[in-house]
Structures are given as structure tokens and as C-alpha cells.
């Protein structure tokens, strides 16, 4: 993000599950659960290299044992551009999160968790492919979590613009918690399409858990409104 430029994303995520993955990664029935989140994410360029990131959310959900509704996680951090060329970028993000009343980890009970510290390395590149603009990004993160097991996360995104106003994206979210006696793992896939309308963009997609262990097989829509300024 360049000096003085910004981005805001208002996003709704609705996830539900009645199946889960056991310690051996086998899919089994679980008590039905539903989790919904409405979040606002922002980026603002403090300088050409330093970007402020924030995120706040409201959340609600229920299963057979508990209902919850209230504040979701609050995130604050800084991203520094280590390398930036016309086609590629490498950045380092350092941030902190105050966990909310909902599921702060897919394997945990609602409300479990306190404060997280995160270090994340991001690397991305863009290319032309058959007349269309494409890009790919890899993110690797380590989270030190209070009240929850520490986590390692790897996120991969691939995007293609078949026309200047349309963006197709495939994203993979992979993670593992240092939980005991079984380390929870998950791999989720999100496919979405985004339509640009000047400074605004509209995004709609679907997210689903593909594999893992000690984690729910959740799935549901993701809808977002983007605003660049």
C-alpha cells in the first residue's frame, strides 16, 4: 500500500458444519454448529513501505450446548515492504489480536482464547497470462496464542483477471495447532469472484474444509464489499 492510499473490506462469513474430522482425519458426524461473522478490515499506507492493518468483527453462533453473540477478534498490526518491484513484493507483518466471544479457533469452544501475537511473511508476484493479468501470493505465519495452542499457518492465493473488471480467486488456508494430545490440522479452500465498480468492488465466494484432523468440516458463503481510497 502506497503512502496515503487505503483499503476497507466489509465481509460476511457464514459457516456451518454437521461433520468433523477425527484424530485420524476420518470424517464423522458431529453436533450441528453454525458460526457467523461480520468484519471490517482496513489497510492504510503510512509510508510507501509501511502499512497499518486493522480488523474488527461482530460474531454469533450456536451448537447443541451454547449460543454466543458479541464482539469478535480485534486485530492491529504493521506490514513492512522488504522488497518491491513492478512485478513482485515481499513483506513482513507483525501484529496482535484480542480474541472475541466466538470460536477463536475451529477446534476450540466459544470464548476460549485471550491475546495472540503474530509474525507473517508475505511474498507475491504478478504476470500476464494469455492476455489476462494473473497473480499469486504465499503467506507463512506463526501465532503465539494465550489461552489457545500456538499455530503455524500457510495461506496461498491465486488470482486471474479475464477482463479488467472481473477477478477470479482461489485461496487455500492451511494450519496446524500445537494442541495436545492431538495436533489439530485444517485445510480449507475458498473460491470467489469479484466485480470492480470504480473505487468499489463486490465479492462473493464459497469456503469449505477439505481435510484435516480434530476440526469441523465447515462450509458456507463469503460476501464482501471493497472500497479503495
List PLM regions with ranges.
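Short helix-loop boundary/capping segments
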Residues: 142-144, 152-157
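Transmembrane beta-barrel domains of Gram-negative outer membranes and organellar outer membranes
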Residues: 1-145, 161-226
Amino acid at each position: 500500500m502506497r503512502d496515503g492510499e487505503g483499503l476497507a473490506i466489509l465481509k460476511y462469513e457464514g459457516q456451518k458444519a454437521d461433520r468433523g474430522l477425527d484424530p485420524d482425519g476420518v470424517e464423522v458426524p458431529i453436533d450441528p454448529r453454525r458460526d457467523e461473522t461480520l468484519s471490517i478490515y482496513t489497510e492504510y499506507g503510512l509510508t510507501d513501505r509501511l502499512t497499518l492493518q486493522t480488523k474488527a468483527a461482530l460474531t454469533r453462533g450456536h451448537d447443541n450446548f451454547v449460543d454466543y453473540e458479541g464482539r469478535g477478534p480485534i486485530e492491529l498490526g504493521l506490514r513492512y515492504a522488504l522488497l518491491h518491484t513492478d512485478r513482485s513484493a515481499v513483506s513482513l507483518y507483525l501484529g496482535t489480536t484480542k480474541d472475541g466471544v466466538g470460536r477463536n479457533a475451529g477446534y476450540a469452544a466459544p470464548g476460549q482464547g485471550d491475546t495472540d501475537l503474530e509474525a507473517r511473511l508475505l511474498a507475491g508476484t504478478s504476470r500476464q497470462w494469455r492476455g489476462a493479468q494473473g497473480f499469486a501470493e504465499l503467506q507463512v505465519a506463526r501465532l503465539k496464542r494465550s489461552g489457545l495452542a500456538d499455530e503455524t499457518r500457510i495461506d496461498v492465493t491465486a488470482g486471474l483477471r479475464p477482463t479488467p473488471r472481473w477477478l477470479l480467486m482461489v485461496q487455500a488456508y492451511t494450519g496446524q495447532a500445537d494442541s495436545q494430545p492431538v495436533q489439530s490440522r485444517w485445510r480449507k479452500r475458498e473460491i470467489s469472484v469479484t466485480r470492480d465498480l470504480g473505487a468499489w468492488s463486490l465479492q462473493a465466494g464459497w469456503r469449505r474444509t477439505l481435510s484435516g484432523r480434530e476440526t469441523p468440516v465447515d462450509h458456507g458463503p463469503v460476501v464482501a464489499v471493497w472500497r479503495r481510497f
